[in-house]
Amino acid sequence: MGTARFLSAVLLLSVLLMVTFPALLSAEYHDGRVDICSLPSDSGDRLRFFEMWYFDGTTCTKFVYGGYGGNDNRFPTEKACMKRCAKA
């Protein structure tokens, strides 16, 4: 029983790393922190459908967010997205 739990934990950790690691590689870092505006669009799990905004490197673009998961490059309005991510 202990071996099965250990293998399940290793499998879960592996899946989480496979999902998270590529997004972190594509992100930019400032002062050791991830710049959320450089993260890719991530709709999360599609349990619901919310119209949200993400910064695509140039401007803010609409996308459908599933309501769970995803990353922090997600804003409720275009104005909030531009305020956080647009460079003056």
UniProtKB/Swiss-Prot annotation:
* Record localization: Secreted
Among the Pfam families in the record, one is Kunitz_BPTI
What GO MF terms are annotated?
potassium channel regulator activity; serine-type endopeptidase inhibitor activity; toxin activity
An annotated GO BP: envenomation resulting in negative regulation of voltage-gated potassium channel activity in another organism
Matches recorded under InterPro entries: Kunitz_BPTI, Kunitz_BPTI_sf, Serpin_venom_toxin
Would the keyword Transferase be found if you checked this record's keyword annotation?
A: no
- Report the superkingdom from the record: Eukaryota
- Give every BPTI/Kunitz inhibitor domain span: 37-85
> Which SMART domains does the record cross-reference, listed alphabetically?
KU
* GO CC term, one of those recorded: extracellular region
User: Pro-region residues?
Assistant: 28-33
Q: Does the keyword Secreted apply?
A: yes
Q: In which tissues is it expressed?
A: Expressed by the venom gland.
What intrachain disulfides are recorded?
37-85, 60-81
Residues carrying the site annotation May bind Kv1? 39
Note the site residues: Reactive bond for chymotrypsin: 47-48
Residues annotated as signal peptide: 1-27
Q: Which family does it belong to?
A: Belongs to the venom Kunitz-type family. 03 (sub-Kunitz) subfamily.
Q: What else is known?
A: Negative results: the recombinant toxin does not show activity on Kv1.1/KCNA1, Kv1.2/KCNA2, Kv1.3/KCNA3, Kv2.1/KCNB1 and Kv4.3/KCND3 channels, as well as on calcium (Cav) and sodium channels (Nav). It also does not show detectable activity on thrombin.
Function as written in the Swiss-Prot or TrEMBL entry:
Serine protease inhibitor that inhibits trypsin (Ki=9.61 nM), kallikrein (Ki=24.8 nM), and chymotrypsin.
Q: What is this protein called?
A: Kunitz-type U15-theraphotoxin-Hs1e
What lineage, starting at the top, does this entry show?
A: Eukaryota, Metazoa, Ecdysozoa, Arthropoda, Chelicerata
